[in-house]
Amino acid sequence: DIDFAAVLEDASAKGTVNVYHWWTAGGEKDAIESVIDEFKGAYGKVKTKSNAIPGGAGGAMVMKVKVLQQAGKSPETFQAHPGQEIQPYLDANMLLDLSKLWDYAKLNERILPGIKDLLTAPDGKNYVVPIGIHKTNVIFYNIHVFEKYGIAIPDHENITWGEFWDICDQLAAKMPDGEYPIDLGDRKGWPACQVFEDIMMGTDPKIYQDFINGIYNVEDVTKVLTTYAKLMDYVAPDHSSRDWYEASGQVVAGTYAMQIMGTWMQPLMTSMGQEYGKDYGIFTFPGTDGWFGMNIDGFVVSNDSADVEAGLRWAYNVSSTPVQQRFSALKESISPYTDTPDDCYNELTLKFKNELISDTIRSYPSFTHGTALPWSASMSLQTQVQEFATSSDHDAEYFANKIVNILKEAGVKGEWNLVD
């Protein structure tokens, strides 16, 4: 049995921690470097090895970790989304129960209200230490493009579907050949799936709840995909040839006016010298006013690595206030902890944080980002939705049948309660 207090309080301990994460884009890279820097300050004799596994939405991580574990080289700690995504690791019996770490670091008292349930596994234990929260249902737009083509920017961020289609129509009419109202940047598939998720929530939260609970019908999914097909009329036709961050670069360049993306796009915009309110603005995805699409990043610890104690020290340090302050400022993410001071946030991140803790805004779990659907179903869904987005005719009913079959085959049975 591990003496958690003794391990975590031993600042002179030696060892090596292999840290696997998926942060490679501008701003994200600086954020993870700041965590490593703080870790070195706390446990100076422990060597840190940073390993970036890009692949997006955490999908590539599960496969990488499985391979490492089978080779007897489980990483000491690695990034994960809480919820269904950690199930393959639990099935492999490779995660260390961090409930005692949670007690020692007083995480139960410190954690933001409303996210604790997402961080508790079905067996009642805690395996994840959260590091940051992002909102998924957001549209970023280039203010200069709107001004260039004389598109009136609404004085409110919670736009309706009608306002959204009107903006798309105006942009499409005025932008020259080779420039488009929207880009997806879905070379890796998951951004296309996240748009599907946003459209589903923006169509009807009840359809979303049923979908993640495994109560599905082809008609509902067809309805969502029909809206998606309409959206594709405004999207750059070569959208799947770019990664999400390359698409963001083209939004900054003015080739595309808008991108539907989570708030991890913020630090990327900052790294490209873009300022919120001056260079870019945001809309809440149409139909999702009053909802916060939840994406929680965290770290888990392997119970079978070469240095389990080093992994524990890393996970503990992630929740410390100095790490949270530096990381949240650079990543422009919301700290999961109530004792992280608000002065580490810029204007936009603070706005999102206030939304998250507001009594009038409800959060919902992402199925693209590992929380709400089994990992295998989420991966298959990403592939299928990307195929839909890249298909020439966007046949909603055909793909709705394929998507429903994915949930059937995965035996999806959820107990999510989003709508009264």
Regions found by a protein language model. Give the residues of each.
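A structural signal for short loop-to-beta-strand junctions that line the ligand-binding cleft
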Residues: 67, 75-76, 107-146, 180, ...
